[in-house]
Amino acid sequence: MYLTLQEWNARQRRPRSLETVRRWVRECRIFPPPVKDGREYLFHESAVKVDLNRPVTGSLLKRIRNGKKAKS
């Protein structure tokens, strides 16, 4: 089931201004990403805001940053 931007925002613990939610959509901070249908966004009812401030860690990222020595 899909919800409009206003409906999705109203279901959040702390509803934000509509412009803030639109900015989150443009910055890909909502997962799964909303679908643009004409003039409005449609959100999946299970969509959540993703926090981009958390550090990204992973073995591949470490290998890219440190070279082959990080693999072993």
Swiss-Prot record:
Keyword check for ATP-binding, yes or no: no
User: What's a Pfam family in this record?
Assistant: Exc
Which GO MF terms are attached to this record?
DNA binding
Question: What keywords tag this UniProt record?
Answer: DNA recombination, DNA-binding, Viral genome excision
Q: Name one GO biological process term.
A: DNA recombination
Taxonomic superkingdom: Viruses
Q: What does this protein do?
A: Excisionase and integrase are necessary for the excision of prophage from the host genome by site-specific recombination at the att site.
Q: What is this protein called?
A: Excisionase
Q: Say which species the protein is native to.
A: Escherichia phage HK022
